[in-house]
A protein has these predicted regions:
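Contiguous, well-folded functional domains in the mature portion of proteins
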Residues: 1-263
Length: 263
């Protein structure tokens, strides 16, 4: 009974957040945006629409576009770029089918990929990086490599928070939460990018599959959310850039690794 009540309240909160974020009444949406800007001390220099008056509703503001000149895309063909603005949570090798959620806490690759055995085999002993998007970050998600978007599979799940406290206390957090699994194919390297939803995430949107995207092209948006996990297969060597470290802030478009085929 307790779980039913908890789920009902969670769903009610979710629906309420969605409705509030889409309110177009100027007095309300302007108050919401101004309050958010003040609380998170957000500088709008990187965004074409700099005033709270320029946005239709709060979600329009939250998923605001960025000035492309402020996020140059690394043009090295063999580079992996950060798909988002955020903070690096973990990165490294996928070993024994496990990834670090946070220090001393693992989760299973098989579960993260929703039980897809073929993908699990291809990415076992590969590499990964997880990046957390705070509420004040830019919330559009971009292609980390050039390639064809072959899959976009939405996995239903819960809506736990994904901040530091949640990562430390909720086992298998990324597996439990709703997430969008996308797969890119390219001659140099395949790549999986997983967009993990969080509490108060209204939705995750994504672009069309079976299309070719350049590195840095917009692929999706968090309409109030969360974390991105990038996976590289076991036939690709990832040489992480010197600035890549846990708790390091990264910007969309900057190089985070050099990729090469393992012969």
């Amino acid at each position: 009974m307790f779980n039913l009540i908890q789920n009902f309240l969670s769903d009610l909160l979710q629906r309420t957040v969605i409705k509030v974020s889409l309110i177009e009444i100027k007095a309300i949406k302007n108050l919401l945006i101004r309050t958010f800007l003040k609380n998170y001390q957000i500088e709008m220099d990187d965004y074409p629409r700099k005033s709270h008056l320029d946005y239709k509703h709060f979600n329009d503001f939250f998923t605001r576009e960025i000035d492309p000149s402020k996020r140059p895309i690394d043009d090295n063909h063999n580079s992996l770029i950060s798909p988002v603005d955020g903070k690096i949570v973990e990165f490294g090798k996928i070993e024994e089918g496990r990834l670090f959620q946070i220090k001393d806490m693992h989760y299973k690759l098989h579960g993260l990929l929703d039980g897809n055995q073929t993908l699990t085999q291809n990415y076992e002993n590969g590499s990964y990086i997880s990046i957390y998007l705070a509420p004040y970050n830019y919330h559009r998600v971009h292609a980390p490599i050039k390639g064809d978007l072959k899959m976009a599979n939405m996995v239903p799940g819960e809506m736990h928070r994904v901040d530091q406290n949640a990562l430390s206390n909720i086992e298998n957090l990324y597996i439990k939460n709703q997430r969008l699994i996308t797969e890119f194919n390219d001659s140099l390297s395949d790549c999986i990018m997983i967009m993990v939803a969080a509490r108060n995430v209204a939705s995750i949107t994504h672009k069309e599959i079976n299309q070719n995207y350049e590195k840095g092209d917009e692929i999706g948006r968090f309409n109030l959310g969360s974390t991105v996990v990038v996976l590289l297969p076991n036939d690709v060597q990832a040489e992480w850039d010197h600035h890549v470290s846990i708790e390091k802030d990264v910007k969309m478009g900057e190089k985070i690794a050099q990729l090469s085929k393992i012969k």
